[in-house]
């Protein structure tokens, strides 16, 4: 899949309305140091230094979709307890529609507590209900689907065998979706895949595929037999088997098989990687992407996810950046404004502080680099607005720039301190600032606050302006004069 198509998918993610149905849970992480053995028993003692609560299970799928820029609704059942309240508040805070979540006082909201030291899990403690939700709760979810379901572009089913996804509810959801040609993407659990019959695509891992097919996967031949059996058992259009360090394999009706190698650079934790695969594949299908390209995109996202500890989300920037890593593209950071606006919106949804600066950057020198490094220190990512060739000619005369905009953008994108480069053709970056709405606007020390274009815009929504001093004696003009003095007569 070409990068421009991936960028277009993310740029239009806001048009995708996704419904996530499944088992919700809280993931609690206790981080600490394990440097002692207990005198009471031969076990490690963990001195807890930090605690964190994240949304897990189907909730992590929803969080991933939000991070990708989609509109998201969730249908599920939680207990009438503190953990259920935490989940509902967390979703609402992210703009996730919780109308389809049923509160049942007789149930316990799932909470998994993981104890970690040196980024490794030591023990996990579970508190949860595993009983089926019952006919009344099934009917309430189906009623929600009948009332609101026509607005969804895709339905993602996240099954953790905690009782929400009963055979009755699954049959109702799949029948509803098939009637309306809405794709249903399922992350399955258990060995009975007949309950998912009629879904569009399933995404089991290798161990799950073995259990469901009854075939031990030892080589490509046994893998293909397992895939074909599951396609038939569940009457699927497609099947994606994730294979850890071996990537994933896509099976389509008619015997077509596509093997996709992994792109994970380093694996810290596989927790939640399946949620990321489900979210990205579902988003891709909703956005009109085919199964093969959707699986490749999900594979890239999974490679990013396993490089993080615990349940986490993956941003469009990380996915596009990984595509650039795979393809060896040095200009993966260079975006047009439409694409960049979608990416930045998703980054902000994850709480990232965006810094913006702009300039010509003709003949890059150490003063530029130090300035950009300082600008990057004010936030989590730096966007550079780069004056186009035409813009520079209007500002500095027909002899400038010395280096064209494509080369300048490529050179600047190679700097670690720069996350994105966007070329603009106007005389000022005001349109960029109004569109991207950075938290911090940075300009050189030769400006006064009153002279900074976009200052009023940034300050109007609580942002700020930072002025950074230049390195004395370092400028493009000085370099040009030095070259002319040394070589002008030759």
Curated annotation (Swiss-Prot):
Keywords for the protein's UniProt record, in alphabetical order: ATP-binding, Carbohydrate metabolism, Kinase, Multifunctional enzyme, Nucleotide-binding, Nucleotidyltransferase, Transferase
Chain intervals for the UniProt region annotation (Ribokinase): 1-330
Enzyme class: transferase
Record InterPro entries: Bifunc_HldE (IPR023030), Carboh/pur_kinase_PfkB_CS (IPR002173), Cyt_trans-like (IPR004821), PfkB_dom (IPR011611), RfaE_dom_I (IPR011913), RfaE_dom_II (IPR011914), Ribokinase-like (IPR029056), Rossmann-like_a/b/a_fold (IPR014729)
Region annotated Cytidylyltransferase, chain positions: 356-490
Pathway named in the protein's UniProt entry: Nucleotide-sugar biosynthesis; ADP-L-glycero-beta-D-manno-heptose biosynthesis; ADP-L-glycero-beta-D-manno-heptose from D-glycero-beta-D-manno-heptose 7-phosphate: step 1/4; Nucleotide-sugar biosynthesis; ADP-L-glycero-beta-D-manno-heptose biosynthesis; ADP-L-glycero-beta-D-manno-heptose from D-glycero-beta-D-manno-heptose 7-phosphate: step 3/4
SUPFAM superfamilies in UniProt: Nucleotidylyl transferase, Ribokinase-like
CDD domains registered for this protein in UniProt: RfaE_like
GO biological process, one term: ADP-L-glycero-beta-D-manno-heptose biosynthetic process
GO molecular function: ATP binding; heptose 7-phosphate kinase activity; heptose-1-phosphate adenylyltransferase activity; phosphotransferase activity, alcohol group as acceptor
Entries under NCBIfam families matching the protein: cyt_tran_rel, rfaE_dom_I, rfaE_dom_II
Family of the protein in this entry: In the N-terminal section; belongs to the carbohydrate kinase PfkB family. In the C-terminal section; belongs to the cytidylyltransferase family.
Protein name (database record): Bifunctional protein HldE
Species per Swiss-Prot/TrEMBL record: Geobacter sulfurreducens (strain ATCC 51573 / DSM 12127 / PCA)
Organism ancestry: Bacteria, Pseudomonadati, Thermodesulfobacteriota, Desulfuromonadia, Geobacterales
């Amino acid at each position: 899949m070409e990068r421009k198509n991936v960028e277009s998918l993310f740029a239009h993610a806001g048009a995708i309305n996704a419904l996530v149905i499944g088992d919700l849970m809280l993931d609690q992480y206790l981080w600490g140091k394990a440097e002692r053995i207990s005198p009471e028993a031969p076990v490690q003692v963990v001195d807890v230094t930090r605690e964190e609560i994240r949304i897990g299970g189907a909730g992590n799928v929803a969080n991933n979709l939000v991070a990708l820029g989609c509109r998201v609704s969730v249908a599920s059942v939680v207990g009438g307890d503190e953990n259920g309240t935490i989940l509902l508040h967390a979703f609402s805070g992210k703009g996730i529609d919780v109308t389809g979540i049923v509160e049942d006082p007789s149930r316990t909201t799932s909470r998994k507590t993981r104890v970690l030291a040196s980024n490794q899990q030591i023990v996990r403690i579970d508190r949860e209900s595993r009983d089926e939700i019952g006919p009344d709760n099934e009917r309430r979810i189906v009623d929600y689907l009948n009332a609101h379901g026509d607005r969804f572009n895709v339905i993602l089913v996240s099954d953790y065998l905690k009782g929400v996804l009963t055979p009755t509810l699954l049959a109702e959801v799949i029948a509803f979706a098939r009637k309306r040609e809405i794709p249903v993407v399922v992350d399955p659990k258990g060995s009975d895949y007949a309950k998912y019959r009629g879904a569009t695509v399933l995404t089991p891992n290798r161990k799950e595929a073995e259990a469901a097919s009854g075939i031990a996967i030892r080589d490509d031949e046994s893998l293909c037999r397992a895939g074909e059996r599951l396609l038939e058992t569940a009457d699927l259009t497609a099947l994606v088997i994730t294979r850890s360090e071996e990537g994933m394999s896509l099976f389509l009706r008619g015997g077509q098989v596509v093997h996709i190698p992994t792109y994970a650079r380093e694996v810290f934790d596989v927790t939640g990687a399946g949620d990321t695969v489900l979210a990205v594949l579902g988003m891709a299908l909703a956005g009109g992407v085919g199964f093969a390209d959707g699986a490749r995109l999900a594979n890239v996202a999974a490679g990013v996810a396993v490089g993080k500890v615990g349940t986490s989300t993956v941003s469009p920037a990380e996915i596009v950046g990984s595509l650039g890593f795979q393809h060896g593209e040095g200009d993966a950071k260079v975006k047009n404004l439409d694409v960049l606006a979608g990416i930045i919106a998703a980054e902000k949804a994850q709480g990232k502080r965006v810094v913006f600066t702009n300039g010509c950057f003709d003949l890059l020198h150490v003063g530029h680099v130090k300035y950009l490094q300082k600008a990057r220190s004010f936030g989590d990512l730096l966007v550079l607005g780069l004056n186009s060739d035409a813009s520079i000619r209007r500002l500095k005369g027909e002899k400038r720039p010395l280096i064209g905009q494509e080369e300048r953008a490529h050179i600047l994108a190679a700097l670690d301190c720069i996350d994105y480069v966007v070329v603009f053709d106007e005389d000022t970056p005001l349109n960029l600032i109004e569109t991207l709405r950075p938290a911090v606007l940075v300009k050189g020390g030769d400006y006064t606050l009153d002279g900074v274009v976009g200052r009023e815009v940034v300050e109007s929504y609580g942002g700020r302006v930072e002025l950074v001093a230049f390195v004395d004696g370092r400028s493009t003009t000085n370099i040009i004069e030095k070259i002319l003095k040394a070589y002008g007569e030759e």
